[in-house]
Amino acid sequence: MSVLPTPLANQLLIALPALSDPTFSRSVALICQHDENGAMGVLVNRPSEYTLGEVLSQMGIDTSDERLREQPVLSGGPVHPERGFVIHDDARAWDSSLEVGQGVYLTTSRDILEAMAAGDGPRNALVALGCAGWGAGQLEFELGENSWLTAPSDANVLFDTALEDRWQTAAGRIGVDLFRLTDYSGHA
C-alpha cells in the first residue's frame, strides 16, 4: 500500500514552462479534491468563448447586472465541459457545495447562479465550464516529472488578478519567476 503525500486540496497547481499540452500549458488550476483515488481541479486562468450572461440566458436565468453579464466564463478543463462549477468565497449552504479550504468553496448547483443574477450571490465568484481530473497517482507522477509547481491557494490570485496574469502571479507568490526557468527538465 502506498502512502499518499500531503493532500493537495486548496493548492494552486501551476504549469511549468516545459508542460506543452495545449490544454494545460501556462495554466493555473485550483485543486478542489485530492485523495488516494485521484484529484479534481478547475483551471482558473483560461477564458472560454462564453460570457456569464450567455450561460445564464441559456439556463433561463435573467439578470440586469451588466458587469455580471460580461463576466467571462472560464474553461475549467477537459472533463465534463458541459457542467458548471462556481468557485466562490461564500459559506452559505448552497444545494451542492464543497469547502475547498480557507474560505474558498466549489458549488455546482443552479441556486448560486440564481442568487448571483438576483444580486444576492457571493462577493467573489468564478464560473467555469468543465474541470480537470487526474487518476490515482497521476498527479503525483506529473509533479515528479516537473510538470507542475504547487502553491497555497490565494484569494487575491483567484479573484483579484487578471486572467492573463494569474500564471505568473501565482508562481511569484512562492518566489518563482516562470520566465527565468528553462523549458526542459532533468532527473538526478
From Swiss-Prot:
Please report which protein family the annotation says this sequence is part of: Belongs to the UPF0301 (AlgH) family.
Task: Cite the InterPro entries for this sequence.
Answer: AlgH-like
- Lineage of the source organism? Bacteria, Pseudomonadati, Pseudomonadota, Gammaproteobacteria, Lysobacterales
* The organism of origin for this protein: Xanthomonas campestris pv. campestris (strain ATCC 33913 / DSM 3586 / NCPPB 528 / LMG 568 / P 25)
- What is the protein's given name? UPF0301 protein XCC2748
Q: Which domain of life is it from?
A: Bacteria
What is a single cellular component term in the Gene Ontology annotation? cytosol
